[in-house]
């Protein structure tokens, strides 16, 4: 009996499932900025994820999930390069893949196409250990199709009919279903004037130097340099990435310098905040010598929090996060910042790709700060932007993103209109 993990057909189906993500990763790697190339490729490849999901036989379901988990989320293990547990990197990739193998086995347990339709649409609600980056809906972020559940259901039905044995009989139905899922506002470009005078900083701070105290002076000088450059451009707000200032800012003399500079330009910066024995991943907004603070609400599973029962959580926190009494804590709710008449919601990395951040917010504009150096080089920045674009379109939001070790950008709620700021060398 052939080992199911080495089923070649399952691997090819997994490649079909993730093809739109990898195609966009290649475009990002070669800095291809023509949006019509991205839209054409995504519109053709994203439905293949549905076709792979539909056609995988039950005895290959586990293998499909295993390969999808490895192909989409191998980068989760790359952060171990900066720990004392580098040797665990291959094991982490395999463990992640096994989790998604089990998940897909359950999702594809029945081969009935309408069961597969419901399980595909429901898969984005299933978050193993709180990790919510498997959102197949987001594969359509840069496609000509709408990204709501109804439209995705129509596309899946079209896949059912167009892949039927009696194609001639069902071809017209399939085509009509695809037409029904089209976004007929394809050529609409959203007005981004509200955020046109904001400077998004892309930094290149290596992860192995970021928390080195000997490198702090260099980080401070680069921050001051970027602020002065933004002032010369007459920008009203400058945005730095997550933990751009990598130590607790509140008790640092550098805070006074930022307060003084905020007389002429507002400064939004990612940093850390200590309160008692709790550590918060925070964003500070300096304006007119005053400061607003928002702490991260949704912590990254296994990176900032152990999503496990307490009897496992405590020893693993001690093992991976060290003997320090300081542990990451989260804020109880999201906060919005107000800058004159401009209101926006600040988000920090992982929480920016989570549905709760968008579904309950009256804010039109979201500003996200990320440190992607943990996972560079990998497909993580592409997958992140795919998810962010999905939420921008799904909830009609404008998302600004300032990142370390990846591209900074402004995402439009319409299909067209994104503005990318390529990372500096």
UniProtKB/Swiss-Prot annotation:
GO terms for biological process: lipoprotein biosynthetic process. PROSITE patterns: CN_HYDROLASE. It is found in: Cell inner membrane. Its EC number is 2.3.1.269. The chain crosses the membrane at residues 10-30, 34-54, 60-80, 88-108, 120-140, 144-164. Pathway: Protein modification; lipoprotein biosynthesis (N-acyl transfer). Signal peptide: none annotated. Residues 201-425 form the CN hydrolase domain. It comes from the Bacteria. The active site is at residues 242, 296, 349. It is a multi-pass membrane protein. GO terms for molecular function: N-acyltransferase activity. It is an enzyme of class 2 (transferase). Pfam families: CN_hydrolase. Catalyzes the phospholipid dependent N-acylation of the N-terminal cysteine of apolipoprotein, the last step in lipoprotein maturation. Belongs to the CN hydrolase family. Apolipoprotein N-acyltransferase subfamily. This is Apolipoprotein N-acyltransferase. It comes from Helicobacter pylori (strain J99 / ATCC 700824) (Campylobacter pylori J99).
